[in-house]
């Protein structure tokens, strides 16, 4: 079951079972669940669009899909405490898109955020060719339209 030893930590195979898992949040807090889900969707969408922590501020917002990603509240948050329209810009500036966050967690942190899973190096958990890759790369990671 163990794939490799990294320092004093054991890394198990990246696929122990095939089941759709998602971020877990407490019951009875649909507003928070929506925020967590859409942060994930936004990170995946940003990587699909090659929008990274380095280039989000100069992304072409004349493209409607890019503008929705970077400048739309999407009705998230609560009536008393809605998210700002630039919430996804805050996510990107903090952790980057999905590929950047994956690389910083499981690889050497040098991924450019848009060249695809195969460009990631020094990974303790490879993403290329696994369920963790984007759908466009044969993986399972996708996001609905940012609407």
Per-region residue spans from a language model:
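Short, flexible coil/turn micro-motifs enriched in small/turn-prone residues
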Residues: 2, 133-134
């Amino acid at each position: 079951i163990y794939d490799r030893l990294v320092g004093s930590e054991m890394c198990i195979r990246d696929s122990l079972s095939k089941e759709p898992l998602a971020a877990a949040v407490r019951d009875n807090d649909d507003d928070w669940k929506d925020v967590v889900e859409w942060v994930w969707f936004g990170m995946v969408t940003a990587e699909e669009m090659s929008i990274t922590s380095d280039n989000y501020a100069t992304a072409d917002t004349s493209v409607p899909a890019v503008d929705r990603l970077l400048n739309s509240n999407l009705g998230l948050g609560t009536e008393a405490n809605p998210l700002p329209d630039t919430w996804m810009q805050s996510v990107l500036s903090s952790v980057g898109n999905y590929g950047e966050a994956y690389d910083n967690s499981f690889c050497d942190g040098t991924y450019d955020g848009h060249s695809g899973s195969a460009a990631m190096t020094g990974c303790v958990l490879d993403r290329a060719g696994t369920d963790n890759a984007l759908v466009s790369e044969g993986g399972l990671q996708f996001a609905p339209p940012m609407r």
